[in-house]
Amino acid sequence: MEQTSMGKDSSKTAIAKFVPDDDGVLKHTIKVHQQPTSATEKKGPSMIARSNDLIEEIQIKRRFGEGTKPLFERDDVKVNTVADGESISSKKIKSHKASSPSKGVNGLVKQNSPDVTQKFTKKYGSSENPDFRRHSSYEKDNYHKSNSKSGVHLEGHEGNYRPYFSDPIRERDRLRRLYGSPNERRSRSHSPSSNRRRSSHRSRRGSGSPRSRRYTSRHRRRSNSQDRTSWKHNPEHRTSRRSRTRSPRGNRSRRRSSTSSNEDDEREYRHRHHRSQERSYQNVLPTLPPALTNYPCHYHVAPMLALPGVQHRPFLPMVASVRHLPPQALYGGLAGAMPFIPMPMTAYRPHLGHRYPPPRHKINKKN
């Protein structure tokens, strides 16, 4: 029996041939196709083949003073060693000592001397006691520096340190407020950035304030006619009195400002109303007294303007004391048209439409 295996991608194919002992013809041939499972397809770290030559070439390099030392050394991974003097922590200590040698070096030596430690431990107990930190100058300085409000520690920086953001105008105003004369302490100059913020805030607010809104609406109202009876019910006035925002926080101040603006508007309207009453007769068109017509006063005349197809004919005569003719004014010398008033009809006429016709059967009659 002979076995041959062929590998294609991830599947494996095995062919088994059965050869008889004597030189006969091959009778059976078996072909086995094996499909790998999904578990073998997952490539983990254990399936990555690493040769010895590849392991020797692995070397991880770090930048200057980057990272910390590994917990344990590995034979297959080499890391470049950094001297203790070149580490970042030692640099911080060195810069702190160089910036303040009296406090840094001498203070540390004096603070850690056995005489000082015995003196403090006798008086305030061990260093774990909070009184020890309160009365120790070095610990107190470190405690206040760590709990500062600004959170920016400039101890480790050199002398040529420049902040990331500097505003010379603000710095000048701050120095004037601190050390200047009383007149200079009230500085009204603003930096370009603050001016930009103020202008954007004004443009965003627009005419939302009640004062500016009052002036603009007043100007709009003056441009229109001054003799308006429905001034309060005007939609323009309603929109000017309505609040622009709906925030619940500013309701109190907005109500106060709106009431003051409404009072001013009412006062101005009253003043303007009296003024318009005085000038009300200046713009009235001149008219003449009522003129007499050519027709007798006890005849009611059909209007020619309303019904031009109807001829001019008199209706039933009426007594002048019962129904008076309305006065006619002459506009430019032309007589006005007479209004057509139909005569009242008291008789019931079935061919005409009535609002309440009489009932045709007796429903309210009592037996």
Swiss-Prot record:
Q: List the disulfide bonds.
A: none
Biased composition annotated in UniProt, kind: Basic residues: 195-223, 239-257
Q: What does UniProt give as the signal peptide span?
A: none
Compositional bias segments (type: Polar residues)? 109-129
| Keyword terms | Differentiation, Sexual differentiation
A Gene Ontology BP annotation from the UniProt entry: female sex differentiation
The Basic and acidic residues compositionally biased stretches are 130-144, 229-238
Ranges where the record places region Disordered: 86-280
Please give the function described in this protein's UniProt entry.
Sex differentiation protein controlling female somatic sexual differentiation. May act by promoting the formation of a splicing enhancer complex.
List the protein's name.
Answer: Female-specific protein transformer
